[in-house]
Amino acid sequence: MSIRKRMNVLFGTLLLTGSLFSQNVCVSTPETSLVLSAPVGGELKHVYYGDKLSEVDLQNINLTGTPDMPAYPVYGLNCPGESALAVKHADGNMTLQMEIVQVKTSKEGNAEITAIELKDKVYPFYVNVYYKAYQDADVIETWTEIRHQEKKPVILNQFASAFLPIRRGDVWLSHLYGSWANEGRLCQEALEPGMKVIKNKDGVRNSHTSHAEVMFSLDGKPQENAGCVIGAALCYSGNYKLRIDT
């Protein structure tokens, strides 16, 4: 069994390319760097996203004490926050503990793909996390592929296309909502503690109600001509749910 879900993530002024340094995966643009900790046999973690790092910075980033977070958190042994993936194995166990099997990079047209394969420590259950970095646009495409080789079906209780931690601060969310003949209404709101959910269960008619696109303003209320933003959009139609946990 396999499942593939996909999301486009637009990092304002962000064009992602991939390179490996030691146990870290560095996905860089001309102006920014995204660093993931990816030791084989260890947990995939998000280390840094911000201004582009030099080679010296990359060599010393593990010495800075920069806090890291799971890059694709699963429900299991330690899950204080929202999980990207939660399953129920055939024997009733609901625990996952994923470790990195391998990291691969490849090129596809004008894009570079970083593929990180994860496997549960006990069960033959696998997750591949992909980052596809386009070279001619400030966009990366990220998605997950889920598969297993267990003898009986595995129930997927929750499975996300992607997960992105954002540092807390004066962060605002912009998104579109509406109804028939009143589509595309803009909502801008400060992120408060708790869970924000944007969802649509209207099949392919997503433009009528809540849209599957969001933008995070990282430095306060959105402005027309200035600011640091991260945008994300699902690249398929249909029912969806975007969860923002603060």
Where are these regions (language model features)?
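Polysaccharide-binding surfaces and accessory modules of carbohydrate-active proteins
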Residues: 24-35, 43-245
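Bacterial N-terminal signal peptides
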Residues: 9-19
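Bacterial N-terminal signal peptides that target proteins for export
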Residues: 1-11
